[in-house]
Amino acid sequence: MKCILIAVLCAGILSCSPRPVAGARTDNKADGGYRFERNGWIYVHLEGAPERLGYQHDYLLADEIRELLRVVGPFLEHTTKRDWNFYRNAAEKILWPKIDAEYQRELDGIVEGLAARNVKADRWDIVALNAIEELPGYYVPWLDKQQGKQASAQAPGNCSAFIATGSYTKDKRIVMGHNAWTDYVVGSRWNIMFDLKPEKGERLLMDGLPGVIVSDDDFTVNSAGIMATETTITGFEGFDPNGKPEFMRARKAMQYSKSIDDFAAIMLDGNNGGYANDWLVGNNHTGEIALFENGLKNHSLHRTKDGYFVGSNFPVDDKLRLEETHFDPNNKQNSANARRARWEQLMAQNRGKIDVETGKQMESDSYDIIEKKAGPNERSLCGMVDQSPRGVPDWDWGRFFPGGTVQAKVIDGSMAEKMEIWAAIGHPCGPDFVAERFLAEHHEYEWARGLLRDMKTQPWTYFRIGEQRGQ
């Protein structure tokens, strides 16, 4: 029946991958997986043991993985002054030995699927791709410091997120929202909606990148009622090469958590400091929400059943800020602080009214609280730095850098029960990004020609687990 399902889907879906390949096994590991496309998203269902999850992942997304690998190496070489072989070597020497066997099997399953689809990539390509956040922005500056060099990269400061409960929401239950800020090279390809049904642990619904086993920006709900998202900590400095990769800990935390305490404990087990985040976590069964700030030396956990937490890339704990970042909390005009001020304003204005629709509006908010007018720019919750003559120096984003909000997601308690998400690709606050027009206006980014691609603004779109095309 599963084979028939895949065949039917392929007949009606543009660019549907699975398809027969030479030498495929009779017990095809791709069985059970399927994909369809909707409003810029590629919905992918994966199920089974780790190696099957990995094989299905690549078998269904081979073209997208090939394309992401094509652009990410040149992009990182320009922005971090390290070539792709550097990242492959770090994946092999620094990360692989600390990855749990379950996820090693899944990653190797992706590699096996790549071979079946004639994509030339190996284990170290895929591990490096999964570490696309923690290696460039955390390992690289740490290594520079160890070698007595000036840091060639900085930790990123991307995303705007909130979580609210109790008297702040319309139905007194949890509402959570997030929009992902990143460069448009990678961000325009951050368009996968994964329905992940592993052999062990909880089922997951999450957005993500092709070839990557964790949401990574992050927005996930699991079948135990745990929902989580995050924003990175601007100016963070620190990395422990003896720790476990963040991408593995984040995936494991969502797959095996049944409580907020579970989530924090898994993230702290073997913490390497990579991709240091302020995590916004909710327990749909209790209505409790938490802000878990996860640095390397410092961490804190704030929780409530009546209130909210917001994230826009500012450190919350003063001790962490002073010991592990160079963040300036007094610069009211920088991106993180301006967006924080706007968050506080919106949460006060919408107390008792926050629901999914309000969440969509807030994640699409383009107001610049400093200039007191609509943006979007680097200081609006939904941002377009390609429209800003200031850029974001804290993130090494120059004037008119091609980066900003690339997609957004919202969920509430009733949706979490059924494992549903509303999501929108592109700028929910602005027009399409047209690569050729941008490059014609900004010759300083000519190096990104062939890496940047158009990114169309798409409508908010509903997804749920087990969904089929047309449902």
Predicted feature residues:
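Positively charged n-region of N-terminal signal peptides that target proteins for export
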Residues: 1-5
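C-terminus-biased signal that marks the final domain/tail of proteins
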Residues: 21-159, 169-171, 185, 201-202, ...
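C-terminal motif of bacterial Sec signal peptides marking the signal peptidase cleavage site
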Residues: 14-15
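Active-site rim segments in enzyme catalytic domains, especially the processed small/beta chain
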Residues: 164-166, 170-260, 265, 310-312
